[in-house]
């Protein structure tokens, strides 16, 4: 039988079916809660459980080390009774906001030896409405789907740009290397919760690993379009310089924000530019910053990268609510 999920201090309630995660039930009901990886890694969907009982969803952990004692991961649990939750935020979704399109490949080039820069065009007269930092689903012929962040800003709405890393054996990684101009893809968007507030004037530190740069590019291009004046630092990590594949974007932001700061973090010490940081992105954060109490950190990358940056930022005084993560996980339900 279905159980009811009640959101604390609101009139919102929605059903959770047997075998359905609380997060999926909320999204199905048109209620957006914070989330990213949907695999129990990022901790974004952690919510206080006030009343009721939960059970594991598909064998996933209902808590991880990022959860406070009374918190549960909404992606990893299902309702075993009626429950009441207190998420960090929530909002009603516009039922007309999410659209499914047949998009055409406009161009497909290599931005790096293992990264495809895939540009898609929408049908004539159609526009992709999304917010900076959100992602889309690519529906594959076998019924599976893969998620990728939009790298273009929302005002460039006649098409979509994706940065696709080639994962050995990856389902879409194999497909993308064969795509040519005129081929079509079945896409659906937008997905993902929005954490950054455009009117927040505090210093912003963006940390990316590899193609975690894609959503950050969308965010920074959007801030530039809005003429937001803010102290912004980008720490972008890769094994070698070829992984930092879009220097033109860095050059543009330096012109928009004279105070813009860029730190390249390279882990392959045998191929090190003179001005790069030798080491991981969390090392770069600790080296180049002091107290982060009045900062905002937006981090995009693998679960391990996000966790290492979260730990470093917390050690440096960043408040938990000022750390925003977009976790890239592989597989059918992971966000790439």
UniProtKB/Swiss-Prot annotation:
Broad EC category: oxidoreductase
Single GO molecular function: NADPH binding
Binding site for [2Fe-2S] cluster: 37, 42, 45, 75
Named cofactor requirement(s): FAD; [2Fe-2S] cluster
Temperature behavior of the protein's activity: Optimum temperature is 30 degrees Celsius. Approximately 60% of maximum TPADO activity is observed at 15 degrees Celsius, and activity is completely lost at 50 degrees Celsius.
Domain 2Fe-2S ferredoxin-type, first and last residues per copy: 3-91
GO BP terms: phthalate metabolic process
Keywords: 2Fe-2S, Dioxygenase, Iron, Iron-sulfur, Metal-binding, NAD, Oxidoreductase
E.C. numbers: 1.14.12.15
Description of pH dependence: Optimum pH is 7. About 20% of maximum TPADO activity is observed at pH 9, whereas no activity is observed at pH 5.
Taxonomy, superkingdom: Bacteria
Chemical reaction(s) catalysed: terephthalate + NADH + O2 + H(+) = (3S,4R)-3,4-dihydroxycyclohexa-1,5-diene-1,4-dicarboxylate + NAD(+)
InterPro entries reported in the protein's UniProt record: 2Fe-2S_ferredoxin-like_sf (IPR036010), 2Fe-2S_ferredoxin-type (IPR001041), 2Fe2S_fd_BS (IPR006058), Beta-grasp_dom_sf (IPR012675), Cbr1-like_FAD-bd_dom (IPR008333), FAD-bd_FR_type (IPR017927), FNR_nucleotide-bd (IPR039261), MRET (IPR050415)
Cofactor annotation remark: Binds 1 FAD per subunit. Binds 1 [2Fe-2S] cluster per subunit.
Pfam families associated with the record: FAD_binding_6, Fer2, NAD_binding_1
Domain FAD-binding FR-type: 98-197
Iron-sulfur in keyword set: yes
Keyword set includes Iron: yes
Oligomeric and partner information: Monomer. Part of a multicomponent enzyme system composed of a reductase (TphA1I or TphA1II) and a two-subunit oxygenase component (TphA2I or TphA2II and TphA3I or TphA3II).
Family matches, as PANTHER family: NADH OXIDOREDUCTASE HCR, PROTEIN RFBI
Function: Component of the terephthalate 1,2-dioxygenase multicomponent enzyme system which catalyzes the dioxygenation of terephthalate (TER/TPA) to 1,2-dihydroxy-3,5-cyclohexadiene-1,4-dicarboxylic acid (DCD). TphA1 probably reduces TphA2A3. It can also use 2,5-dicarboxypyridine (PDC) and 1,4-napthalenedicarboxylic acid (NDC) as substrates, and preferentially uses NADPH which is the physiological electron donor.
Protein name, per record: Terephthalate 1,2-dioxygenase, reductase component 2
Organism the protein comes from: Comamonas sp
Top-level taxonomy: Bacteria, Pseudomonadati, Pseudomonadota, Betaproteobacteria, Burkholderiales
């Amino acid at each position: 039988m279905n159980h009811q999920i009640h959101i604390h201090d609101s009139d919102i309630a929605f059903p959770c079916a047997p075998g359905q995660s609380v997060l999926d039930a909320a999204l199905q009901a048109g209620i957006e809660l914070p989330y990213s990886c949907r695999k129990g890694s990022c901790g974004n969907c952690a919510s206080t459980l006030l009343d009721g009982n939960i059970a594991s969803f598909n064998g996933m952990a209902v808590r991880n080390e990022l959860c406070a004692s009374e918190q549960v991961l909404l992606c990893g649990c299902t309702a075993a009774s009626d429950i009441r939750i207190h998420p960090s935020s929530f909002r009603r979704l516009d039922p007309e906001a999410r659209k499914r399109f047949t998009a055409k490949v406009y161009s497909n080039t290599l931005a790096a030896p293992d990264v495809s820069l895939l540009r898609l065009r929408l049908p004539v007269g159609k526009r992709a409405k999304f917010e900076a930092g959100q992602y889309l689903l690519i529906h594959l012929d076998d019924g599976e789907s893969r998620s990728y962040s939009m790298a273009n800003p929302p005002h460039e709405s006649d098409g979509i740009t994706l940065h696709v890393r080639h994962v050995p054996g990856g389902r879409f990684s194999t497909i993308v290397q064969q795509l040519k101009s005129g081929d079509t893809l079945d896409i659906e968007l937008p997905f993902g919760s929005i954490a950054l507030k455009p009117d927040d004037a505090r210093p912003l530190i963006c940390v990316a690993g590899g193609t975690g740069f894609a959503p950050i590019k969308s965010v920074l291009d959007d801030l530039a379009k809005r003429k937001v004046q803010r102290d912004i630092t980008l720490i972008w990590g890769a094994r070698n310089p070829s992984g930092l594949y879009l220097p033109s974007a860095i050059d543009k932001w330096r012109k928009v924000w004279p105070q813009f700061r860029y730190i390249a973090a390279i882990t392959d010490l045998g191929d090190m530019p003179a001005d790069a940081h030798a080491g991981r992105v969390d090392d770069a954060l600790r080296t180049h910053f002091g107290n982060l109490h009045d900062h905002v950190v937006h981090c995009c990358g693998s679960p391990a990268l996000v966790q290492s940056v979260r730990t470093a930022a917390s050690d440096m005084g960043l408040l938990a609510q000022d750390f925003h993560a977009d976790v890239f996980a592989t597989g059918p339900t992971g966000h790439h």
